[in-house]
Structures are given as C-alpha cells and as structure tokens.
Amino acid sequence: MEGKLVGRTALVTGGSRGIGKAIAEGFAKEGAQLVINGRDIKVLEASAQHIRETYGVPVLPIAADVTDEYQVKMMVAEAEAFGPVDVLVNNAGVHIASSFLEYTFMDFKNVIESNVYSVFHVTQAALVNMVKREYGRVINLASTAGKWGSRNQSAYNASKHAVVGITRCLALEMAPHNILVNAICPWVVDTDMAKGFMSEHSKALGVGEEELAEKMNASTPLGRLIKPREVAGLAVYLASDDASYINGQAWTVDGGYTMI
C-alpha cells in the first residue's frame, strides 16, 4: 500500500465523529493504522469498522474519558501495544456558550477539563515513548477562538488559548527529540458540535438559529462553514514527513474570515 503515512500509527481522540472521524479517515487513506478514542464504544466500533472496510487498515477503538488520568494511561498503554504511537491528534472537546455572568462554575470547569486537561493527560502519556523513540507528531485541535475573544464564549476561548499556548511551549521542549507539535485553528466546522454551538449561541444572543446561520455564512468570504475534510487535509500534511520542518505553529483554517 502506498501513502504518506504507511508504517505509522496514529491515536485520534474524539475520533468517532465530526472532525476527529474525518482526520482518522484522512490518515487511513494515507496508510496509517489507527487508534480512535471516544466515550461511546458502539459509535467507536461502527466508525472503526467503516474505516477498516473502506481503507483496509487496522483500527483499534478504545472508549476512555480523556479527562481521567488513569483511563488515559490505560488507553495509551493499549495503543502502544497495538502499534507504537507516532502521531497524536488531540481532538476531543466540548463547547458551552453562555454570557459570562450567567456561566455556572460547573459548566466553566467542564469546558476547561474537557478541552485543556485532556490535552495535558493524553500528550504527557504519549510523549514518554515518543521521546524514547526520538520521533513524534502532535497535532492539537484548537480554534480561531484560541486567537481572539468573542462574546458568550469565555470558557471555550480560554480553553483554546490554552491549547495554543501548550502547543508552542511543547514545540520548544520536544524539538530536540525530533517531535513536532502544531495546532490547527479552524473557524466553525459543519459538525454536530457546531449545530449545538449554533443553538446555544443563538439563545445567548437572542436571535433565531436560522438568522444566526445566515449571518455566520455571510461573515466569511467563502460564504459557508468549513467541511471536516478541509481540516483533515491539513492534519494529514502535518502528520507526514512533508511537514518535517514545521513546528510550533497555530494554523488558521477559516476561509478568510480573519481578514474581514
């Protein structure tokens, strides 16, 4: 089999749906064997079977809560036994929109734990063996929300700024070990999570979901949301040897939104 990732094993958190699933399929298309993580084993197994049948690569589904240090260590150990983890994609996360004054502490804590602590736990566990092997690629899914502020998204924006910060610090620490660390910062991607975001955000702004969707589409030069495969293509590039001199970058994928 030919492909840019033949002989590599990739671990993708949140890999059973949305952006994570698209990235997993992009990796599989290039020949990587996969470990996909999520919380729902039935959804994971269905996604794994689809990838096996479509691309003919080995796929190991592992259900684990990536905010739980013990579960993460067990997951990474199982992934390493399946095939040394060469590429890690931290994609798992949540989004809760609310005005700052109405945010509950538990909701704020949930966002930070899901979007930041998960990156800490999974990356730290995976890096141990990457350092021993003197090779690795870490790709963190951040967001354009990790580059500026926006209304009703204080927790989410804070979490994604943290992910970008972790990415840049690790890029410096891990470079001597031939481990590259980069982030992808998409605008709104057309996924189920985005639909939930639109619903929450429309309520927080006091406008209808359809009206908000029209405004969002009109706010970007391309006039539409991002397709998951458009994020996956960049992840494939960053995981490959084509990107062997790219490190510590937070790649914006927004159709030109930030130019306006």
Regions found by a protein language model. Give the residues of each.
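Active-site helix of classical SDR
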Residues: 123, 159, 167
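Substrate-binding pocket helix/loop in short-chain dehydrogenase/reductase
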Residues: 99-100, 104-112, 216
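Residue(s) in the substrate-gating loop at a strand-loop-helix junction
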Residues: 143
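The beta1-alpha1 cofactor-binding region of Rossmann-like NAD(H)/NADP(H)-dependent oxidoreductases
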Residues: 41-42, 63-75, 105
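Short, small/polar-rich loop/turn modules that mediate ligand/substrate recognition or access, typified
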Residues: 175, 180, 246-248
